[in-house]
Swiss-Prot record:
Protein name, as recorded: Acetylcholine receptor subunit beta
GO molecular function annotation: acetylcholine receptor activity; acetylcholine-gated monoatomic cation-selective channel activity; channel activity; excitatory extracellular ligand-gated monoatomic ion channel activity; transmitter-gated monoatomic ion channel activity involved in regulation of postsynaptic membrane potential
Keyword Methyltransferase part of the UniProt annotation: no
Higher taxonomy: Eukaryota, Metazoa, Chordata, Craniata, Vertebrata
Residues modified to Phosphotyrosine: 394
Organism per entry: Bos taurus
Domain of life according to the entry: Eukaryota
Length: 505
């Protein structure tokens, strides 16, 4: 190799050793060797045996994934923010070329075993063991991400107009309060933060829930929930007070239920002769049953309370059931006749004469009451008629038109027969009718009686049909009132169920 090539190679080696990056890596390597010489990651970083290690616990919420009401489980994506001081990992930056922080793997340093106590899946670990940031003064900061499934007791009384108070309880699993003391997280200004932190730029909104309050609190239970008798373990509890967005249930459940209830109400507006009263009522009842079965998979299986939407569905189902029963009553009244039922006087007084005035019903007058009386027949006195004196007396003594064919008396139709018999026999038995005329009059009176009976039968049947129509209209207004009042009472109660203005009143 020529002398020039050797000179270039020597200059390259010297430049590599004198480069700033190389010096920095060597300085950091030497610092690591110095810090971890004799370091034990299983030993608590306390200067004295009785000293406590202060651990600050913060929580950054990245996403409220879901709240499973049936399993009473809340899923969240969070970042833990743990800060403590390890005096063994401190140095003077001036002695190490200005290095003021290091990134060290989590397996190499002591970590406070802070876990989620109320987890619902048995997973106590974080999602990723990221590096710990170590500052020159010995302060440690670890921000591992995690997807937690925590238990959340669901209050279903006002579902779907409800709000829930879900908690995430963190504590050191191995150390009690005499060894590790917890406190809530610190803000960038160094002040204690009393709530869950949410970064507005990266937070993912939930389509079903909105966060109302997110406070945190340090709790010192008097009894160790894990059964340890050595000492109390402090807990930091993060609260998420969330309110449900009810639009989905309003559109897909409540609005169809109200429409089905309207169908059940208008069953009573449908004429009984239409033949679809029972079909429409049963259709509404079956539809509500399907809605009830669909909601059964949404709410927790608890006997502590009944959700308000289930109350409304049951209320509607009871009304629809009664509409089916009352439709049977209306159809029974509609198809009654004088041959099968006799109308009591109180039924006639209430449902024909009194109630229609208050229900806006007006029965049309019979046509016979609107017809004018036919003109009376003038007496005949024709000597050539050939009928004789008895015939003349018959026409002279002919009674008014409603005597031979009296106006119907639906209560006492039998009274017309004696009057007609007295007319045929005549007031004076000395005055008689010819046999031919008596036979004609007898036939006419028989036809008149048959027509009268048929007319009375039709009138009484129309009375039953009118009673059925009055009862139908009475049920219509009754159901409108009950449905309106019941719906307002049920849902107005939910409007007053609001999250508290102060999370800790």
């Amino acid at each position: 190799m020529t002398p020039g090539a050797l000179l270039l190679l020597l200059l390259g080696v010297l430049g590599a050793h004198l480069a700033p990056g190389a010096r920095g890596s060597e300085a950091e390597g030497r610092l690591r060797e110095k810090l971890f010489s004799g370091y034990d990651s299983t030993v608590r970083p306390a200067r004295e045996v009785g000293d406590r290690v202060w651990v600050s616990i913060g929580l950054t919420l990245a996403q409220l994934i879901s709240l499973n009401e049936k399993d009473e489980e809340m899923s969240t994506k969070v970042y833990l923010d743990l800060e403590w001081t390890d005096y063994r990992l401190s140095w003077d930056p001036e002695e190490h070329e200005g290095i003021d922080s290091l990134r060290i793997s989590a397996e190499s340093v002591w970590l406070p075993d802070v876990v989620l106590l109320n987890n619902n899946d048995g997973n106590f670990d974080v999602a990723l063991d990221i590096n710990v940031v170590v500052s020159s003064d010995g302060s440690m900061r670890w921000q591992p991400p995690g997807i937690y499934r925590s238990s959340c007791s669901i209050q279903v009384t006002y579902f779907p107009f409800d709000w829930q108070n879900c908690t995430m309880v963190f504590s050191s699993y191995s150390y009690d309060s005499s060894e590790v003391s917890l406190q809530t997280g610190l803000s960038p200004e160094g002040q204690e933060r009393q709530e869950v932190y949410i970064h507005e730029g990266t937070f993912i909104e939930n389509g079903q829930w909105e966060i109302i309050h997110k406070p945190s609190r340090l709790i010192q239970p008097s009894v160790d929930p894990r059964g340890g008798g050595e000492g109390r373990r402090e807990e930091v509890t993060f609260y998420l007070i969330i309110r449900r967005k009810p639009l989905f249930y309003l559109v897909n459940v409540i609005a169809p239920c109200i429409l089905i209830t309207l169908l059940a109400i208008f069953v009573f507006y449908l004429p009984p002769d239409a033949g679809e009263k029972m079909g429409l009522s049963i259709f509404a009842l079956l539809t509500l049953t399907v809605f009830l079965l669909l909601l059964a998979d949404k709410v927790p299986e608890t006997s502590l309370s009944v959700p308000i939407i289930i109350k409304y569905l049951m209320f509607t189902m009871v009304l629809v059931t009664f509409s089916v029963i009352l439709s049977v009553v209306v159809l029974n009244l509609h198809h009654r006749s004088p041959h099968t039922h006799q109308m009591p006087l109180w039924v006639r007084q209430i449902f024909i004469h009194k109630l229609p005035l208050y229900l806006g019903l007006k029965r049309p007058k019979p046509e016979r009451d609107q017809m004018q009386e036919p003109p009376s027949i003038a007496p005949r006195d024709s000597p050539g008629s050939g009928w004789g004196r008895g015939t003349d007396e018959y026409f002279i003594r002919k009674p008014p038109n409603d005597f031979l064919f009296p106006k119907p008396n639906r209560f006492q139709p039998e009274l017309s027969a004696p009057d007609l018999r007295r007319f045929i026999d005549g007031p004076n038995r000395a005055v008689g009718l010819p046999p031919e005329l008596r036979e004609v009059v007898s036939s006419i009176s028989y036809i008149a009686r048959q027509l009268q009976e048929q007319e009375d039968h039709d009138v009484l049947k129309e009375d039953w049909q009118f009673v059925a129509m009055v009862v139908d209209r009475l049920f219509l207004w009754t159901f409108i009132i009950f449905t309106s009042v019941g719906t307002l009472v049920i849902f107005l109660d939910a409007t007053y169920h609001l999250p508290p203005a102060d999370p800790f009143p």
